Amino acid sequence: TLKRAILERRFGKMYSVNINVFWTRPQEYYNQAKWRGTWAMDGGALMNQASHYVDLLTWLIGPIADVHAMTGILARDIEVEDTAVLNIRWRSGALGSMNVTMLTYPKNMEGSITVIGEKGTVKVGGVAVNEIQYWEFSNKRDYDKNIFKNNYQTDSVYGSGHVRYYKNVIDTLNGNTDPETDGEEGLKSLETLIAAYLSSRSGKIVSLPLDR
């Protein structure tokens, strides 16, 4: 529904976008398997746990122009980051940030996106973007009155998206439908992730697209 509002240009000029992923992964989680928390086999809070939220940066808001990131290993005994912050400028001129940590006490707290524009403000929160918490636009639509009926409860921070994804893959392979995403969309997210890591290591702003 948020994607629909963006496509309908209900926000007018996009001003600010913020994504928060405040989850927890104790040291015991990483100790369960040798590959967890490694560069070679896993990736950190950005590449692993928050990767789908990175997807939202381009899928919802559009092409990114610049990324400035800081990452750190603040508490866990792992190779990769347990916490990261990103400052982002989109080609549209919108500014935003992404805050990710796997150190939230005592349990998973929030997976959210807030979009602020010239004519509208929306926050989709909950533990895994499963609750529309704020929905205000100057230009009303019929579907606004039922908007909060889209909310649902989930026991998992990953929601139920995996089941629907695999169903789409199977249906596509059987020729019954079209794919909901493709490799090009995945590359956009991967490029953003690489830019964040490059920025974190260099301390500099990294512009997109990257040289390939």
Protein language model annotation of sequence segments:
Residues 1-78, 203:
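Predominantly a Rossmann-like dinucleotide-binding segment in NAD(P)-dependent oxidoreductases
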Residues 3, 58, 87, 166-170, ...:
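Non-transmembrane alpha-helical segments in soluble domains
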Residues 51, 76, 99-107:
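Glycine-rich phosphate/pyrophosphate-binding beta-alpha loops
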Residues 53-54, 165-167, 193:
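A general structural signal for well-ordered alpha-helical segments in protein cores
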Residues 66, 74, 85, 90-94:
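Glycine-rich, aromatic-lined ligand/substrate-binding cores of catalytic
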Residues 79-83:
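A short, glycine/Asx- and small/polar-enriched loop/turn
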Residues 90, 112-184, 206, 212:
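C-terminal glycine/acidic-rich active-site capping loop/insertion
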Residues 192-202:
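Short arginine-rich
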